[in-house]
């Protein structure tokens, strides 16, 4: 223990310098890298999970590159690409790539090309072709749905009958009600109007006929009720003339009294009666109650 303390206390002395030289021991760690390098090659073989002999045979021949080129198009259409994609992540995780990056200066690049070819060999494994067969099952599974689809058609055939059964009744029920009220109303109105017009005309004609009949009766009665009062006065006078002769003078006065009811009677009938009773016509004033006429006769 004392020796390490003394060494730490006197670091500047020459003895420590030779002790410093031993630190190249770190070179010993350099040896581990080769050991680490060696494991990568061991890790490379594991990626070949197939363990089948054919895979290594395919990568061995040089014409393998053209073969992998052709499979990609075949692998693209089917859903197999997702399956091949999963292997690359498994191959990528290995720490082999990062370790080779450090050793390149120590190790010769040739091993890297040897490591490079395996990836392409791993990409086009025969697993895709094996994955292709599975797609056929889906087509077989798809056909069943079409077989199940045909059954639905029967329901449409069942649905139409109710529609046809329901549609006819409404039209038959709806039309009758509207026409019946309209026809009844129109017929009732026409009948009442026609009957009313006929009765009105009949009553009007009856009223006119009764009015005319009553008027004629009144006119006849008034004509019968006419009263004539006639008074005639005759006077005679004798007068002496200038030569001593005597002359007789006769004067006749007629007084006729007619009632005012004559205004309502027919004057023509009344005048005809006067012509029949009297040879001479007289002027009659309907407005005056009486009239007088004078006739003078001279006898020599």
From Swiss-Prot:
Q: Where is the composition biased (Pro residues)?
A: 12-181
Q: Which residues lie on this side of the membrane: Extracellular?
A: 1-187
Name any GO cellular component annotation: plasma membrane
Regions that span the bilayer: 188-208
Provide Cytoplasmic-side residue ranges: 209-300
Gene disruption phenotype: Delayed secondary cell wall (SCW) formation during tracheary element (TE) differentiation.
| Biological-process GO terms, alphabetical | cell wall organization; plant-type secondary cell wall biogenesis; regulation of secondary cell wall biogenesis; tracheary element differentiation
Q: Which UniProt keywords apply?
A: Cell membrane, Cell wall, Cell wall biogenesis/degradation, Developmental protein, Glycoprotein, Membrane, Secreted, Transmembrane, Transmembrane helix
Tissue expression, as annotated, is: Accumulates in cells differentiating into tracheary element (TE) which undergo secondary cell wall (SCW) formation.
- Which Cys-Cys disulphide bridges does the record give? none
> Where would you find this protein in the cell?
Cell membrane; Secreted, Cell wall
According to its UniProt record, where is this protein mainly located?
Answer: membrane
Q: Specify the glycosylation sites in chain numbering.
A: 183
Q: Which domain of life is it from?
A: Eukaryota
Please name the InterPro entries in this protein's record: TED6/7
> What's its membrane topology?
Single-pass membrane protein
Which region ranges are annotated with the description Disordered? Answer: 1-181
Q: What does this protein do?
A: Involved in the secondary cell wall (SCW) formation of vessel elements (e.g. protoxylem and metaxylem), thus promoting tracheary element (TE) differentiation.
- Descriptive protein name: Protein TRACHEARY ELEMENT DIFFERENTIATION-RELATED 7A
Q: Where does this protein come from, organism-wise?
A: Zinnia elegans (Garden zinnia)
């Amino acid at each position: 223990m004392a020796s390490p303390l003394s060494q730490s206390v006197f670091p500047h002395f020459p003895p420590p310098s030779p002790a410093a030289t031993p630190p190249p021991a770190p070179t010993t760690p350099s040896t581990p890298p080769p050991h680490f390098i060696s494991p990568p090659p061991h890790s490379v073989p594991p990626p070949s999970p197939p363990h089948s002999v054919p895979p290594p045979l395919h990568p061995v021949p040089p014409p393998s590159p053209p073969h992998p080129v052709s499979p990609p198009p075949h692998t693209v259409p089917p859903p197999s690409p997702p399956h091949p994609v999963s292997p690359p992540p498994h191959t990528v995780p290995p720490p082999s790539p990062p370790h080779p990056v450090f050793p390149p200066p120590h190790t010769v690049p040739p091993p890297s090309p040897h490591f490079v070819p395996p990836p392409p060999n791993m990409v086009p494994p025969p697993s895709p072709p094996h994955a292709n067969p599975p797609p056929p099952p889906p087509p077989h599974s798809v056909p069943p749905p079409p077989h199940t689809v045909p059954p639905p058609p029967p329901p449409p055939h069942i649905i139409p009958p109710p529609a046809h059964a329901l549609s006819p009744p409404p039209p038959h029920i709806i039309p009758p009600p509207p026409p019946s009220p309209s026809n009844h109303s129109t017929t009732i109105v026409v009948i009442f109007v026609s009957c009313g017009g006929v009765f009105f005309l009949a009553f009007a004609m009856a009223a006119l006929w009764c009015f005319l009949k009553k008027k004629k009766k009144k006119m006849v009665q008034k004509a019968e009720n006419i009263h004539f009062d006639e008074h005639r006065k005759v006077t005679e006078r004798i007068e002496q003339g200038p030569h001593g002769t005597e002359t007789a003078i006769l004067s006749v006065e007629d007084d006729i009294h007619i009632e005012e009811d004559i205004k309502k009677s027919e004057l023509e009938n009344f005048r005809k009666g006067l012509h029949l009773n009297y040879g001479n016509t007289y002027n009659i004033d309907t407005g005056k109650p009486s009239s007088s006429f004078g006739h003078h006769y001279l006898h020599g």
